[in-house]
């Protein structure tokens, strides 16, 4: 019988059984732990020894194994802890998310708080390169998340707020709205980093901006003009800046900011990192040499597919004077009432006119243009963003970078003259995976710009077919069609009655017409190829756009087809045959001539019909027109051509003249294409010529005059008269009523900065000195390296140091007073309001009124309770008193 391992036999109590189980479990745990320690020590020593032996064999004899530096190490070289932490943050597996980028916890927490899970393609390409410290020039289509591409590496580089005086990051934006949007996004993404941000914009009070810079911000978000103004006023040095961003870089370099950008770049240190972002950037980095790039990395995504797949485009051929009527019809009938729409116009006069006109037609709208007051711009944009109005009429000011949520439609009232401007306009919709629609009103003189746009996009332009059944809205994308005249007449009649009833609207319409004429004269010319193709297009026979034809009944469509057929009717009789009898000599000659030329006429009509069929189909993006398909072999065509010449003319003198029919050029191009050897043939321009011409900043690849102007060599004269000819230019003086010389006048209106450049003297008006005197702030160098941000303003003439001469300098490391902020807190505002209310109460005799009211209340209570009721009521009324 086996021995019993448990307690003694007999009746067991519950306490004894529990004690026995506890001891047994404790013995098992101790045995397992000792066994694991023995096996781990033996196996671990064996594995470490095996790894060391293998590494020693790879390194060879006599070479020590690399180890981590210890505390006894006397080397001055310390490991880069930032790189080690970043490598530790990276995941071993390829997750494809933000986790694999090695971002710090505050930055990653801000990304997760914002709701981003997976980086976009441009973020996946650019963020690792920027984190490596390289200069980057990046391009991706609108709505692809370019703002986070330069904000996340900036947060990762700056880490947290620094006590050193001076901003460490600078973000330049071309417009106020884009800078405000960048500030909002910076605060949301960098919520947990503790970095301070200052906003320097034109139109705001400079005193507030002085105070913001005295708060020692880490990041400055600014527009170039106001930043230069503040820098000159404060003698601001930017030597601590180590990260510079040019947002919408191509717009910055072409808006006339060259003088301001040169002054800003001259104030930057030599070793800063530069990042350029935009949706349209050329591949020639020579155009951005002024930005101070050092071995930059070019990253361009979506060069071939510049437009989003979720974006639908429609083009309507309308006259210039009927654009307002078509716009009103689109807003009333095509666009859904709950959708938000942005209308792009050419000038501010168009914006003011359309705002007043649409308001009279019960369309809630607002307008924004560059000359508008900054406060009004902010209010109008907020009204549109919050849904107070459904339509926003803007100039190209809002075409760059603005991310308006829930935007569904864009209407190009004035068709853009550049392809990349069209990209930025329609890029306001179809962002972040949403769908959108872009409607464009194209006047007949804007057809060459439309063809240039499709050359730039690499797409084909589809023309609406006349006298065809409506195909619905499925094939509307990228189609050019007419607007029914009945729609135009219906809307235009209402607009004309509105204009007749309003004198103000008539004045705005007249100003808008004059502005349109100035805009047409000043806009850049289209390419010669597009002008030639536009002249060859048959726009008279253009069909209705399917977006409109699908809304009509069958009877209305038949009426429109009848009107189109009447409009396209061309008489075959000549002037000699009209109202002429059969015996008339002129009529007989023309009939004989037509009978003799019947073959040539038939061939010409066949070619014309082929061209018309080709125009009804998609117009390809090639600069030259595609060849028509030939039905007959070339040899038969040549024989037929020879026979027709001999039949028409009785005598042929000299060589057989080449005919100038429609198929001749196509045949020649096909023959030349067959003779080319693709291996040795070098074209005179690259394949992406049209695309790069549209993206170019300096007009490279544009008109011949622009290229020739850049190649002009100005030689110095060899005589005194020729040397001073350029300086002695005369200018009309309106006050003196005569021509005056300009020599030396420019330098009087300019001042020389610390960088040696001359800028306008209006930048220096001693506003900063006046602000310091008002705030009683002592002079200090805001950009001195190593200074602490705790050095605040020092009060002059204080009670403590009165009569002791100059203030004692603070010892290094001791905190000094901070700058008194001009922005009041909520508690200060509430305290000030209560104090004002109390003062107003006392001034109007409030104490006397209060005491009189209390006396009346006591009398009412005494009359109502004492002496006229039960004793219980008297006691209750006493308690209430």
UniProtKB/Swiss-Prot annotation:
EC number: 3.6.4.13
Listed name of the protein: ATP-dependent RNA helicase DDX54
Span list, region Disordered: 1-78, 596-698, 725-881
Regions of compositional bias (Acidic residues) in chain numbering: 41-51, 635-649
Quaternary structure note: Interacts in a hormone-dependent manner with nuclear receptors.
GO cellular component: Golgi apparatus; membrane; nucleolus; nucleoplasm; nucleus
Organism: Homo sapiens
Substitution effect: residue 286 to M: Found in a patient with a neurodevelopmental disorder; uncertain significance
Residue numbers of Phosphoserine PTMs: 34, 39, 41, 75, 644, 696, 698, 782, 788
Sequence intervals crossing the membrane: none
Gene: DDX54
Domain Helicase ATP-binding residues, every copy: 127-299
Subcellular location per the Swiss-Prot or TrEMBL entry: Nucleus, Nucleolus
GO biological process, one term: RNA metabolic process
CDD domains assigned: DEADc_DDX54, SF2_C_DEAD
Upper classification of the organism: Eukaryota, Metazoa, Chordata, Craniata, Vertebrata
Gene Ontology molecular functions: ATP binding; ATP hydrolysis activity; nuclear estrogen receptor binding; RNA binding; RNA helicase activity; signaling receptor binding; transcription corepressor activity
Expression sites (tissue/organ): Expressed in the fallopian tube, cervix and uterus. Also expressed in the brain.
